[in-house]
């Protein structure tokens, strides 16, 4: 206080003021400090000092031709004195005002296009709704979040090439635009930015915002999609939160959300097929999300959800080195362990073979609604510090950690038999058996765990087996904390391997992901997901399977027909018939298959019994492993619309109806397409017309390769011979004529010769 009084006293004397404002600074150290290097040492002071001068700005000489010397008020706008050390002129801040009011107006058409991300942000905020502010403790955890709404998902390198191509098309340098998205964006932007006068550097900077995902490691308590992160400073503080609903969605959030749904559906479906890995790859390659190929999105999108991780691993991409258990992401932060097999007995005396991790390790566990720090030794939980949004979330985390610890008291808490199976009806591995058991009911586990007296530690509280908080007692080793545990910040990606059953392992053989870890949560995708793979026909229910199966046969009828007559086994094993089997009652599948296969064989053997409609109708039933029996069927049952419906072996039914006159097929009353070939016409019509220009030589001759369809005959060279499949399922040998003169007579001869060749 004394010092301040003294200073005030000094400043009131005019001499003091004069010394401070007038004397030159001549101390070398001070001069050095403020003049060495190009870096401004005190920017704010410099700015204030410059703006106090009359002409603080320098500009190119030609500005004097564009701006008057004085404004309307008669104030000078620029000095006739040149800037020291350059040939620029000194200008008053008033000149800027004059320019803004009276200067030339450029074409503004490009502004919304260049500053698209800003314009869109304003719209989102305008239409967003801010709710009440609540004061409460915020459990924030640092997560890697997307801070840039509305971006495409190009890698930095890809974006750089696009930007160079759009902004500096004539610059030298190799630019390879390969991906679909790169080419589309480049074309779009070049058109948008024709005759754009905005500085190229600004355009490049704004394009980068639009093309590349920018992530930061930020403390978040609520939503993590980019439209929430852009208002993070408005929605959560240290002790308050404000409710907010965004005024619009952005494609990048929609892509992330839809990708997770597609990946989950695909992994769930692949897990129950005969070859999970092959099926998964087939589905990833044939699926589109919002019109973009799923594999392209997987290559660029950094989302770290379990199902997405499995799909990436299958494609040979690197994924995060953390592993998943019970829906929590575990990251080992210290310690190490070795694995060994050990047999343990449950409380029900059931033997389980556990892979035990020996050694001291520490982990962070991060889930959707709870996080924890776990310290464990061999089959022993030393400490677990949990924080979560609500009691339920905390329970989930504790159960997962207790099972993960592999403690004996946990194994002994099992009541009843463990026989959980996955979607493919295979038994789960022991760790997941235990997990499922206690996720259903953790009462016994918590009661058997044991309790201990606790010390009073700031920010931590005990928790009892019935989940009531306590300051005196707690379950052994378990504490609840007010603070969240940060997600693992390091975004390192590691090379992984994946086995046939979709278990993903790191190079040390630790399982990081498996189908058991994929969430069962169902959601509605924001973008349209188009699954072209037959494996996904089931996703829209039994009717869709039925219609899709028959449509597939009709679309591919030409090749199906040849396989039907030449290589039926290969045809029956086609994966396109796999979904259909789920519609056929399990007990009778084999008999149906045996019956249909025998029927087909008779059609192949007995002339004139080939019937297109009937083959199409019955073909899917022949795909199941056949049981030999003498049973005959007049109708076959399929389970659709919640009950068994009948398909008549001969004739139409509501399930399968073929109209001979219109040649239209309707399945369950829905149009399923046209059959190209009418089964009941004699050979003469279609074949003789098509076989003009060919000579029929006789019966099939295997030396000339597999039978061609009539459409494929056009590829033959003159004089070349081939087997050809004709309407009634018969195969004959033909030769393409060397001359065209006798084509007219061919159609009559063809009819006769076909009959002879066959008989």
From Swiss-Prot:
UniProt-listed InterPro entries: Flu_PB2_2nd (IPR049110), Flu_PB2_6th (IPR049114), Flu_PB2_C (IPR049115), Flu_PB2_CAP-bd (IPR048298), Flu_PB2_middle (IPR049111), Flu_PB2_N (IPR049106), INV_PB2 (IPR001591), PB2_helical (IPR049113)
Motif (Nuclear localization signal): 736-739
GO MF: RNA binding; RNA-directed RNA polymerase activity
Record site feature (Mammalian adaptation), residues: 627
UniProt subcellular location: Virion; Host nucleus; Host mitochondrion
Keyword annotations from UniProtKB, A to Z: Cap snatching, Eukaryotic host gene expression shutoff by virus, Eukaryotic host transcription shutoff by virus, Host gene expression shutoff by virus, Host mitochondrion, Host nucleus, Host-virus interaction, Inhibition of host innate immune response by virus, Inhibition of host MAVS by virus, Inhibition of host RLR pathway by virus, Inhibition of host RNA polymerase II by virus, mRNA capping, mRNA processing, Viral immunoevasion, Viral transcription, Virion
Keyword NADP recorded: no
BP GO terms, sorted: 7-methylguanosine mRNA capping; cap snatching; DNA-templated transcription; symbiont-mediated suppression of host cytoplasmic pattern recognition receptor signaling pathway via inhibition of MAVS activity; symbiont-mediated suppression of host gene expression; symbiont-mediated suppression of host mRNA transcription via inhibition of RNA polymerase II activity; viral RNA genome replication
Main location: virion
Pfam short name (any one): Flu_PB2_7th
Any Gene Ontology CC annotation: host cell nucleus
Self-association and partners: Influenza RNA polymerase is composed of three subunits: PB1, PB2 and PA. Interacts (via N-terminus) with PB1 (via C-terminus). Interacts with nucleoprotein NP (via N-terminus). Interacts (via N-terminus) with host MAVS (via N-terminus); this interaction inhibits host innate immune response.
HAMAP family: INV_PB2 (MF_04062)
Function in brief: Plays an essential role in transcription initiation and cap-stealing mechanism, in which cellular capped pre-mRNAs are used to generate primers for viral transcription. Recognizes and binds the 7-methylguanosine-containing cap of the target pre-RNA which is subsequently cleaved after 10-13 nucleotides by the viral protein PA. Plays a role in the initiation of the viral genome replication and modulates the activity of the ribonucleoprotein (RNP) complex.
Family: Belongs to the influenza viruses PB2 family.
Name of this chain's protein: Polymerase basic protein 2
Name of the encoding gene: PB2
């Amino acid at each position: 206080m004394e010092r301040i009084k003294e200073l005030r006293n000094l400043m009131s004397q005019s001499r003091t003021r004069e010394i401070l404002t007038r004397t030159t600074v001549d101390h070398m150290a001070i001069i050095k400090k403020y003049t060495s290097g190009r870096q401004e040492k005190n920017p704010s002071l410099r700015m204030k000092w410059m703006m106090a001068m009359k002409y603080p700005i320098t500009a190119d000489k030609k500005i004097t031709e564009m701006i008057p010397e004085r404004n309307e008020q008669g104030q000078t706008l620029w000095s006739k004195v040149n800037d020291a050390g350059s040939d620029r002129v000194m200008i008053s801040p008033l000149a800027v005002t004059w320019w803004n009011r009276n200067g030339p107006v450029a074409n503004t058409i490009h502004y919304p296009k260049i500053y698209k991300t800003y314009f869109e942000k304003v719209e989102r905020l305008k239409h967003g709704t801010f709710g009440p502010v609540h004061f409460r403790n915020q459990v924030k955890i640092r997560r890697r979040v997307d801070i840039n709404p509305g971006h495409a998902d190009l890698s930095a390198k890809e974006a750089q090439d696009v930007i160079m191509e759009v902004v500096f098309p004539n610059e030298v340098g190799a630019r390879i635009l390969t991906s679909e998205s790169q080419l589309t964006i480049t074309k779009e932007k070049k058109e948008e930015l024709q005759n754009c006068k905005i500085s190229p550097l600004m355009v490049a900077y704004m394009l980068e915002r639009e093309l590349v995902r920018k992530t930061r490691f930020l403390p978040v308590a609520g939503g993590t999609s980019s439209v929430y992160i852009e208002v993070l400073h408005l929605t959560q503080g240290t002790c308050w939160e404000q409710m907010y609903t965004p005024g619009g969605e952005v494609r990048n959030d929609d892509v992330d959300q839809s990708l997770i749904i597609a990946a989950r559906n695909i992994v769930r479906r692949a897990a129950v097929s005969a070859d999970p890995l092959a099926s998964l790859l087939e589905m990833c390659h044939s699926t589109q999300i919002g019109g973009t190929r799923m594999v392209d999105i997987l290559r660029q999108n950094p989302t770290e959800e379990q199902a997405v991780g499995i799909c990436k691993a299958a494609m040979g991409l690197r994924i995060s080195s953390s592993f998943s258990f019970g829906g929590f992401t575990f990251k080992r932060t210290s310690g190490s362990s070795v694995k060994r097999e050990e047999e343990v007995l449950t409380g029900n005396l059931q033997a389980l073979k556990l892979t035990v991790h020996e050694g001291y390790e520490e982990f962070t566990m991060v889930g959707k609604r709870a996080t924890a720090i776990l310290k464990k030794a061999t089959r022993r939980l030393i400490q677990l510090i949990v924080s979560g949004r609500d009691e339920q979330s905390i329970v989930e985390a504790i159960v997962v950690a207790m099972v993960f610890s592999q403690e004996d008291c946990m194994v002994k808490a099992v009541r009843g038999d463990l026989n959980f199976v996955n979607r493919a009806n295979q038994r789960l591995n022991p760790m997941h058996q235990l997990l499922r058991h206690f996720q259903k009911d953790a009462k016994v586990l918590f009661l058997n765990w044991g309790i201990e007296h606790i010390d009073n530690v700031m920010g931590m509280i005990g928790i009892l087996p019935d989940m009531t908080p306590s300051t005196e007692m707690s379950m052994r080793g378990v504490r609840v904390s007010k603070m969240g545990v940060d997600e693992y910040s390091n975004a390192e990606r590691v090379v992984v391997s994946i086995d046939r059953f979709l278990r993903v392992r790191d190079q040390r053989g630790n399982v990081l992901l498996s189908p058991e870890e994929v969430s069962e949560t169902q959601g509605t995708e924001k973008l349209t997901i188009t699954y072209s793979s037959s494996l996904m026909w089931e996703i829209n229910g039994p009717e869709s399977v039925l219609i899709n199966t028959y449509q597939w046969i009709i679309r591919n009828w030409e090749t199906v027909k040849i396989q039907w007559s030449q290589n039926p086994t290969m045809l029956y094993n086609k994966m396109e018939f796999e979904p259909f089997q789920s519609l056929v009652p399990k007990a009778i599948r084999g008999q149906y298959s045996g019956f249909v296969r025998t029927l087909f064989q008779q059609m192949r053997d007995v002339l004139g019994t080939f019937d297109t409609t009937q083959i199409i109708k019955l073909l899917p039933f022949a795909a199941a492993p056949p049981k030999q029996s003498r049973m005959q069927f007049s109708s076959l049952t399929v389970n659709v619309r919640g009950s068994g419906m009948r398909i008549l072996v001969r004739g139409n039914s509501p399930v399968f109806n073929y109209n001979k006159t219109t040649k239209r097929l309707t399945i369950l009353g829905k149009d399923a397409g046209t059959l190209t070939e009418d089964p009941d016409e004699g050979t003469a019509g279609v074949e003789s017309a098509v076989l003009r220009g060919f000579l029929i030589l006789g019966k099939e001759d295997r030396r000339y390769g597999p039978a061609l369809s009539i459409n494929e005959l056009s590829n033959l060279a003159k004089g070349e011979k081939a087997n050809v499949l004709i309407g009634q399922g018969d195969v004959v040998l033909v030769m393409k004529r060397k001359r065209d003169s006798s084509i007219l007579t061919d159609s009559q001869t063809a009819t006769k010769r076909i009959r002879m060749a066959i008989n």
